[in-house]
Amino acid sequence: MALAVLVSAITVSNDGPCDIFARGGTPCVAAHSTTRAMYAVYSGPLYSVRRRLDNATMDIPAVAPGGPANASVVDAYCEGAALGCTIAVIYDQSGHGNHLRAGPGRRGHVDLEVNATADPHTLLGRKVYSAYFEPVDMYPGAPHPKEVGVGYRNDNTTGVAKGDEPETLYAVMSGTHYNNGCCFDYGNAETGIFDAGDGTMEAISITADQRGTMHGSHHGAGPGPWVFGDLEQGLFVGNNSWPAPSLRDADNNTFSFVTAMIKGDGASPAAPLGHWAIKGGDATAAAGLRTLYDGPRPCAGKPPACINKGNQSWSPMRKFGGLILGIGGDNSHG
């Protein structure tokens, strides 16, 4: 099972990412992108934009099956419209119907949608727009940040891993536009805006959090950013004391675009702490992906004390199977 998102991308092959995953025996159960089709034959809508002027929406297709998004449709629909457009829906291309919409906020509010035209890029000679996330305070008149985030979710999914079931998550995100805390996530989360305790999430987070993570876990080596796994009650770069390398090149420059992957396996007699791996690297390089961590899950104490302690352990996992993008499981954001 795989979850896949491309927030930004600048290269494509003949096969889509989800074609490659399917050949490996882990077909995508959710596939989201505003920049391209995730399958070579996909011809449905990639996302929907909403005009702020009249609240009307328009689906945005690819220029051709398997191709990049057709930004000319966005420009024609949104250009000149007072206040522009936001991204209303990011469609699930996998066929499971796991579409992403603005999540519920607190006190009756709804999370904010991202600006649909804030971040243009070129993909195969075509202009495309990424989903560009900004802090709540960049939105004039928005509710207090404690009441809303800028993000999308789906609490009623199909086929997404639950409990200690294995899963793989894949994302391409900006390597230069990130936060320094929790939580800008993509992946598996609670099915509501609550914190259900350790091990109830499994999501990718790219951040330069210099504070380390909760429960004594270690942030990565160097200046960051790093690929974290948000497992709820903690962002982790490996286990409790793993100095993962930064997402930077040999000259210490951050990558323009980052590929991030998390592979999570369940606990077993041979691996009572479970097993997970984190990969990351330059999304624009053919050989840019490298293993950043491969080993047991984090532990709230020394084995075997942390095994099977309910809310005090990240193994076995207790995933809910919800989906989030841009926020944490309890709607937190950094």
Regions found by a protein language model. Name each.
Residues 1-9:
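Fungal secretory targeting signals
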Residues 10-110, 170:
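GGW-centered surface loops in extracellular recognition modules
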Residues 41-56, 129-133, 171-172, 276, ...:
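Short, hydrophobic/proline-enriched secondary-structure or compact coil segments at domain edges
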Residues 44-46, 82-90, 95-97, 126-128, ...:
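Extracellular structured ligand-interaction cores
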Residues 95-252, 267-270, 284-292, 298, ...:
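Extracellular glycan-recognition modules
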Residues 175, 262-264, 329:
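Short beta-strand segments enriched in hydrophobic/aromatic residues
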Residues 257-259, 265-282:
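Loop/turn-rich, solvent-exposed surfaces of beta-rich toroidal or solenoidal domains
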Residues 287, 292-333:
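Flexible glycan-contacting loops in extracellular carbohydrate-active proteins
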